[in-house]
């Protein structure tokens, strides 16, 4: 193969594939270059010249850019398997993703990571895996599994593994927790991904000094700039709930691009269908005034180099032939996509080997009743979690709520309704209740087994009866999403693979999500993405007030607090 690449690059024999008649975006100079692009096997072998090809593709009037790289995501949050995610996202130009399977790992442990690694060997796109570092994320919740360093080391040398995934337990790092230290020491010299929302100053210095190189939780340009100036690559995030692109646009410049990359973290097929994936981030950034050279560098070459993938990210000889033919830099609509030199088609997807799903019957919660969700307050005021639309950071609020015969009651005029978390792994049967502000619900309940990071049942509702009905229905369908009103199911989407992923094609999941959103709106929901917004209310590593199966958590103090 090496001899063939040399001969085809030198023009001594026809290349396997030649893209002819178009221009490519040179991310070194920012120029649009008229040139053929020659490909041998999975590599680019020729640019800045004219080539003959065994197979020639006319791309007149089009522009070729490097394949896009999503540097941090949880495929499980797309609610489909890795194979279906491949079908969903690769045609939009995303040729490499760097995933953290900690959603399925929190439910199934090492079995979940193995499922992802097995799947990554069979997909058309290049799925790289970071080993989940914090399972569970904290001691303040009940997960289905625990991963210690001895559970991770058997996977460390897998060809798809880059390093250690987002180290969410930054208090544990700063406190030099022994298990945190064991994981960090084992992966020194390899890539360690970060997760440190609002961490600044000297504590940030200490965290970075543990060997952590990248971070995706910056929600302001000021925070992002501090992290970059201290040596981190900042991953600009725009997901279905966490929408930080607009706030970070001021630092997406040609000067800063080498220290930036793009990620989605959590993005579902409905948003991908309606808006796009990384292509949406690129279009949105350029429309907002970002220079194309800056955002395309962040989407490809800067992302690749941040994670040590030096074989991709440029349209240049010797680089992996991950290429996207787009209509224009501003439009960024993929018309042809090549992954490792292969033109993407349904036939290519159909030829993949399948991987047997895991994690069936993972919802082991006992049946609950309305009386399981009575709530009491120890003072005249009741704490409530304040939703901030488009953010996973929440507010810690207090309200004067009435006390009825069944405890503290919701107040619809104040947009305060009840929230509950039910342990679903069969460990202890914990149930915690609290209140939340910002959903807009006037009736019914919404429930989910997608509930970061331990993925217990999380329910928000206006009555204890509907909360119980929704929670029980999730057990009957092996997990997923449910919308209930007056005890009747208005819409549901089963996620039988670990209570996180569907066994259906992504098109079916997309359509089911549309029905679910409409049903949530019928209950009064004012949120653009109520289900993933609900999923982050139980995540006790994101400020400020959260709820787990063990109770309300003041994340700033890393302590439980009363209602």
Curated annotation (Swiss-Prot):
One of its GO terms (molecular function) is adenine deaminase activity. The keyword Manganese applies. The gene is ade. InterPro entries: Adenine_deam, Adenine_deam_C, Amidohydro-rel, Metal-dep_hydrolase_composite, Metal_Hydrolase. Belongs to the metallo-dependent hydrolases superfamily. Adenine deaminase family. It is an enzyme of class 3 (hydrolase). It comes from the Bacteria. It catalyses: adenine + H2O + H(+) = hypoxanthine + NH4(+). Its EC number is 3.5.4.2. This is Adenine deaminase. PANTHER family: ADENINE DEAMINASE, N-ACETYLGLUCOSAMINE-6-PHOSPHATE DEACETYLASE. Its cofactor is Mn(2+). GO terms for biological process: adenine catabolic process. SUPFAM superfamilies: Composite domain of metallo-dependent hydrolases (SSF51338), Metallo-dependent hydrolases (SSF51556). The keyword Manganese applies. Keywords: Hydrolase, Manganese.
